[in-house]
Amino acid sequence: MASLISDIEPPTSTTSDLVRRKKRSSASSAASSRSSASSVSGEIHARWRSEKQQRIYSAKLFQALQQVRLNSSASTSSSPTAQKRGKAVREAADRALAVSARGRTLWSRAILANRIKLKFRKQRRPRATMAIPAMTTVVSSSSNRSRKRRVSVLRLNKKSIPDVNRKVRVLGRLVPGCGKQSVPVILEEATDYIQALEMQVRAMNSLVQLLSSYGSAPPPI
């Protein structure tokens, strides 16, 4: 009878072997996905350090600055101030940087979308607004107490947030298009945006040196 029961019962070693194999396969697949994601992000970040990308951006930046100069000279209004010219140059440099990114990142798409929104606002006609008479509001003491209670709760919630998350949120407000994103997305976009800005500075320095050497060159005989 015992031999018959032993023949019927399945061996437990096969089940444990299957569990171990599943764990092994899941761990290997997760490691491969992490390695592939890291390699892809590394390739994306490495493009800003290449000379080819810097040449592409320098060409786009030169075209954008020429367009800014043409727009300022063709303007019928008075000559723009230094502050307006500086703002136009910064916007042109950022747009050229976003175009060089080819819309692969959130910050580049946000810069291009912001440009489209500003252009659409300029094209819209101003609507006539009706003057709304001022209305006096009476605030009761109970509403004041509830407002103070809400403010105190918000302060407690702010104190309970870790410093790291709060700093990351501040960083997200500095990176275009990342104000409401998660922490991993903010860190990934900020890394790419910082490297793009570093490449922008290198391209601008090279352009300034080129223009200064061209201006100081003696005239041809």
Curated annotation (Swiss-Prot):
CDD domains: bHLH_AtIBH1_like
GO molecular function, one term: protein dimerization activity
Chief localization: nucleus
Keywords: DNA-binding, Nucleus, Stress response, Transcription, Transcription regulation
Subcellular location: Nucleus
Subunit record text: Homodimer. Interacts with PRE3. Binds to RSA1.
Induction note: Slightly induced by salt (NaCl) stress.
Listed Low complexity bias regions: 26-41, 72-82
Organism phylogeny: Eukaryota, Viridiplantae, Streptophyta, Embryophyta, Tracheophyta
Superkingdom, taxonomy of origin: Eukaryota
SUPFAM superfamilies attached to this UniProt entry: HLH, helix-loop-helix DNA-binding domain
Effect of disrupting the coding gene: Hypersensitivity to salt (NaCl) stress during seed germination and during seedling growth and development. Hypersensitivity to hydrogen peroxide H(2)O(2) and methyl viologen (MV).
Function: bHLH transcription factor that binds DNA on specific sequence 5'-CANNTG-3' in target gene promoters. Negatively regulates brassinosteroid signaling. Together with BHLH148/RITF1, regulates the transcription of several genes involved in the detoxification of reactive oxygen species (ROS) generated by salt (NaCl) stress. Confers tolerance to salt and to the oxidative stress-inducing reagents hydrogen peroxide H(2)O(2) and methyl viologen (MV).
Residue ranges annotated for the bHLH domain, each copy included: 148-197
A single GO BP: response to salt stress
Span list, region Disordered: 1-45, 70-89
Species whose genome carries this gene: Arabidopsis thaliana (Mouse-ear cress)
Name under which the protein is recorded: Transcription factor bHLH148
PANTHER family linked to this entry: TRANSCRIPTION FACTOR BHLH148 (PTHR33124:SF12), TRANSCRIPTION FACTOR IBH1-LIKE 1 (PTHR33124)
GO cellular component: nucleus
